[in-house]
Amino acid sequence: MKLAFLFLGPMALLLLAGYGCVLGASSGNLRTFVGCAVREFTFLAKKPGCRGLRITTDACWGRCETWEKPILEPPYIEAHHRVCTYNETKQVTVKLPNCAPGVDPFYTYPVAIRCDCGACSTATTECETI
């Protein structure tokens, strides 16, 4: 459970932070862009017992086309929902500053190498809907 949290937590953080960068951008091109791309952003890496460390990394961001159409047979809908997600990543480990005695100072996070629009995979992305 802890291993999954260490991996999925940073992945979700990268996706959310990347999404925030897109929403905050003032460029008209970013507002109309449809697709999935690698984009640089900065986040604060932290864990209990250590000071935070600002990290600049690459993450996936974008907007992918989705659609649904009614059909006559169950389940009565044909859905095509794709998300901007990681296709290829590498893991980077950094040492957090000023950790308390007994606290592991190392923090590992994914760096996006390639991103694509695709089906949501719980191995790399938090796939819950609202």
UniProtKB/Swiss-Prot annotation:
Any Pfam family matching the protein: Cys_knot
Q: Which residues form the signal peptide?
A: 1-24
Q: Name one GO molecular function term.
A: hormone activity
The processes (GO biological process) annotated in the record are:
adenylate cyclase-activating G protein-coupled receptor signaling pathway; G protein-coupled receptor signaling pathway; regulation of thyroid hormone receptor signaling pathway
The UniProt record lists the keyword NADP: no
Q: What is its main location?
A: secreted
Task: Spell out the subcellular localization from the entry.
Answer: Secreted
Q: In which tissues is it expressed?
A: Highly expressed in brain and at low levels in pituitary. Also found in retina, testis and skin but not in pancreas, parotid, kidney, stomach, liver, colon, small intestine, thyroid, brain or adrenal gland. In pituitary, colocalizes with ACTH, suggesting that it is located in corticotrophs.
**Which cysteines form disulfides?**
36-84, 50-99, 60-115, 64-117, 120-127
* SMART domains found in the cross-reference section: GHB
How this chain assembles, per its entry, is:
Heterodimer with GPHA2; this heterodimer interacts with thyroid-stimulating hormone receptor (TSHR), and hence stimulates cAMP production.
What is the designated name of this protein? Answer: Glycoprotein hormone beta-5
Task: Show the taxonomic lineage.
Answer: Eukaryota, Metazoa, Chordata, Craniata, Vertebrata
User: Gene for this protein?
Assistant: GPHB5
